[in-house]
């Protein structure tokens, strides 16, 4: 079929005419995935993938979610998902989690599940595949999840409180308003009452047999898919699937999965809500239209629709961002895109989203709608479209170059979507060929014709949701006012957008190149260290982990602790402000346009005792990366519009800080640890006006003007013959300004400190953190001991606080090991949980009990699990460029090799060493900090 006919068919397809579209070619299915279906209807996807090697991911996807619940079952899909981890036919109680952790699968990170409106998915990832018995056991778990979840009365009753705890954690502020608004947004239809977390009254009151009946009704092989991707024998996996799943029967007259339709609305729907915990005034404008039926998603028209949605979204987002920089713009940020209408799959919408400046909700609503109307009337310009095409194709080229280095989850996500909603799954090569044929030939007229269709010109299928901060004296828009704005904007005489583009190179004249003075090779860690003529050092490590990736970092051993109190605020915001500034002769907006289609980026990083840069590129765009490095260190330019927009955004977000329990608690933790210093606290809205742009630019010059202070790291698939001259051109040429900076100590808590306070909130939940802290040498041994100790404690806390007490959705432990101002390590072990207020006083002592028990005798089984997890994670991580950036930086800055002996140290770690570390390093210091936020209901 000729391209002209294809494009005509696409427009017909998008206008809800399917006859022409059905004549178009089908999207090819990737031949490297084995797809099959058993006689009982079970679907399976199996793919061999050896990146990373020796691990695989196991999924079971169900075409079942909250939409399948009856009115008296709201929340059962989610409760059932929880109970899949609390006992099955072959794995009683918590033995499923215990077994998976024993082979290196970490709960939460690698083992989890989620319930959506129309699907429920269970998975465990990065499973070691060197033992066939482990692979077979994992498949047995999938089989149990299919039809063997125990659902004992005891497990159901225990899990009710856990779901309550999750509800307290998730349903806050904006989520609360969405849940309240759904019935009206869906005109009282079923989707309006199927938020996946459900009703707590149903969770509390459902009888065990009711849940079992729901499970039997919907969890059937004809609604399920097994998805296994990784370093596995495909034939063995297929044979095992047939052996385990073929015998599962589908009941006669089994209930059918039926799509729930969403009605059109003849007149506009306006929903305005407010909440005390909402941080910003936000609105969404939906322009509803029919979704593409699943049956047509394998059609080429659907793929082309996705492309057009992508470029339209990127082009209008760029317009919104440019407009937001104008001083009189009433919104802080905005975006638009076409996709599902809220939580439904059977109705789509072109959705506009905006965040208003304080007191400007109506003006912002009009401004965002106006840009959509401008798109409707005039479309986009040729230069805008060219940038969008360039960016899209650069992503396509990057994916193609890395086609053999795709992680398992990139495939499993695609296969879940293919099974549940027939999303296409072409190979990267096939999709790349399609885009290289279509994109250069798809004219702007087709894009603009489609964009015109997206913006409705009547009130039919127009829906607006406004979510605002509840504040004294605030004025909220009415439905009548919003309706009047819509009519006004549609009647306005608009002008076409003018695209102003700077046609200049990033660097007009290349700097005078320096020289590489010395090269030293470290064979143990496989890198080269270059010393340059300006005193800077460069560390190079060539890898083939990703064919099209070069990771970059630069660091110097001084941070914002060097400045006095008068500069704390400026220092805290310096990295963000510098990143939002211009470079050379380019404003931030002009720079975004100039970099379209380039896979290269650099950003500033700044911490108390370190400053630097971080970024990445492809081999093709390595010179752009080097130019950005040079400009970031020599030519940050003032962009007042960008700075003012950033200040407005920060001030708006922080204005309601005192009503946001999460921010209040975070601020309390930081204030307790850093003795109230502004350097560490969450700032107040009133602080933002005191940020001094000129002073930040001066701080930037002091920090980044001394090349000799820096070590630059490049890890990835670079060509050394190409890279070395660029290093001489853009890094060896960097100046030294003579500033001498030195880290200073930041006051930090010591001894026994307690901060217990009360906070009113809508869904009360307590938060507790217990921190044990010390100073010690920065060594590999301390690094391993701190990590292992925290993991052992978390296993205890999950068993006791979550499982036995049902006092929290999650109870965990973390470790911190950071370089301090004096080059020693600041080591901390933290116990954390968001707690049921009624059980908080009972649960908190278990933090200390867990610590005492681990000091006395670490659990031997848990220790072995932790070792397996760490060894597995190390094997996977060490095949990534990011891992090596961290390892080489630690080696260069601290003189500590965290790689070479790591696995042996983990393998040989003894329980007695952990006890000694906790007792004589962590606890002996006597530094213990407790921060507890006790919740009370708003209005009480």
Predicted features and spans:
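Acidic/histidine-enriched active-site and ligand-binding environments that engage anionic O-linkages
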Residues: 185, 211, 392, 696, ...
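Bacterial Sec-dependent N-terminal signal peptides
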Residues: 1-23
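Hydrophobic, small-residue-rich alpha-helical packing segments that form membrane-like cores
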Residues: 155, 160-168, 172-223, 227-229, ...
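Post-signal peptide N-terminal segment of secreted/secretory-pathway proteins
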Residues: 65, 87-88
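Proteolytic maturation boundary segments
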Residues: 21-46, 233-307, 313-317, 325, ...
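Non-catalytic, conformational "gating/processing" segments within enzyme and secreted inhibitor domains
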Residues: 148, 160-161, 211-242, 460-462, ...
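Active-site recognition of the HExxH zinc-binding catalytic motif
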Residues: 74-82, 86, 314, 568-576, ...
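M16 family metallopeptidases and their MPP-like homologs
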Residues: 45-47, 52-69, 76-77, 94-144, ...
